[in-house]
Design a protein with these regions (language model features):
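N-terminal loops that bind phosphate or other acidic moieties
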Residues: 2-357
Length: 357
């Protein structure tokens, strides 16, 4: 795999164009022609208008969809910030490959392919999992940077390549997921710095920490930030010092979606932080970021607000793996079914509605 340099990454970011407002207007006009109250489908109408602005066309094909589940281990787990150890990352990755996990069952119902990806699982590569690994896990960020700046760039580059490859294979909709013990800790650390928020505000219980465990997690993040002194105006510095290979790879996936013109669905808090990194690197990349749900992690809503994105679902989800993103896909299908096949005012012999305000 050819390594990406920072200069090459910056060149790609410069190629990301603003949304196509002509295509957005065409999608809006089509919605307005259908025999229903104007804006009656609310966020579902906005969804396809935003997709038109991204893809450059008011005609869509989301029949092929995939969820990419990026798996990676985090050295900060050594600080006791999780109920489980790194062996669980590998175990879940193996079960993703065997199509036995929660997201696999949900994806089957949503007619969505599942692509488990190894961005940096501790130990040897996992059979049946796409090998995009940067290293066998990150370092403990309480003792120094989690990864080098070059590794952060490379992880982003591999995420970009992943989305672009899926687009080339004909996928019209890409959902994001992740698996990595300790990644709510890394996500909270990155978000606290980028959003200039207190660590305690940005930190939750993850997979179910006790009060003592939560206090240890908050203290660990504070020590990591103090140790590394990341520059909040330099996303690559923050990602490299406090992030994980999964977050960096997901960041790249959103950037890849902006380059390829493919909607990329956020899952919960972790992929939301990755999307925030992508948009901080390139504001125009926001056109490829589509929210699915609002996680119960305390900082999830703050991240969504920073991105200016509204979730389609609020269902108390906090499982990970991309389950929330996949859960939103049927709403895309229903929106498109109405958009494509609902009769128009003209076809129904009905006088069109006109805006009254």
């Amino acid at each position: 795999m050819t390594e990406m340099t920072e200069a090459e990454l910056m060149k790609l970011l410069a190629a990301i164009t603003p949304p196509d407002e002509t295509a957005r207007a065409a999608a809006h006009a089509h919605w307005a022609s259908l025999a229903k109250p104007l804006g009656g489908l609310g966020a579902l109408e906005t969804l396809l208008e935003d997709a038109a602005a991204l893809t450059g066309t008011a005609q869509f094909d989301f029949s092929r969809r995939a969820v990419a589940v990026l798996c990676a281990d985090n050295g900060v787990v050594a600080q006791g910030i999780s109920q489980t150890d790194q062996s669980v990352t590998r175990a879940v990755a193996e079960n993703l490959a065997a199509r036995r996990t929660s997201v696999c069952r949900m994806a089957q119902a949503a007619h969505c392919d599942v692509l488990p990806v190894d961005m940096g699982i501790a130990g040897a590569p996992v059979p049946g999992v796409r090998d995009c690994r940067i290293a066998a896990g990150t370092a403990d960020f309480t003792k120094g940077p989690a990864m080098t700046r070059a590794e952060a760039v490379e992880a982003i580059g591999r995420g970009i390549s992943l989305t672009r490859q899926l687009a080339a294979e004909g996928y019209g909709l890409v959902a994001t997921g992740e698996m990595g013990i300790g990644n709510t800790t890394t996500s909270s650390a990155v978000a606290a710095v980028l959003l200039a928020q207190p660590v305690q505000t940005m930190t939750g219980r993850g997979a179910g920490l006790s009060d003592a465990g939560l206090a240890r997690k908050v203290d660990t993040i504070r020590r990591g930030i103090a140790c590394n002194a990341p520059d909040p105006d330099d996303v690559l510095d923050v990602l490299g010092k406090l992030g994980g290979f999964d977050i960096a790879g997901l960041c790249g996936m959103f950037l890849g979606g902006a380059l390829a013109g493919v909607p990329v669905l956020m899952d919960g808090f972790i992929s939301g932080v990755a999307a925030l990194c992508a948009v901080r690197l390139c504001p125009a990349a926001a056109k490829a970021v589509f929210a699915s749900h609002c996680s119960t992690e305390p900082a999830a809503r703050l991240v969504l607000e920073a991105l200016g994105k509204a979730p389609l679902l609020t269902a108390g989800l906090h499982l990970g793996e991309g389950t929330g993103a996949v859960a939103s896909i049927p709403l895309w299908d229903m929106a498109l079914a109405v958009y494509r096949d609902c009769y128009s005012f003209t076809e129904g012999g009905i006088t069109p509605y006109t805006p009254q305000c």
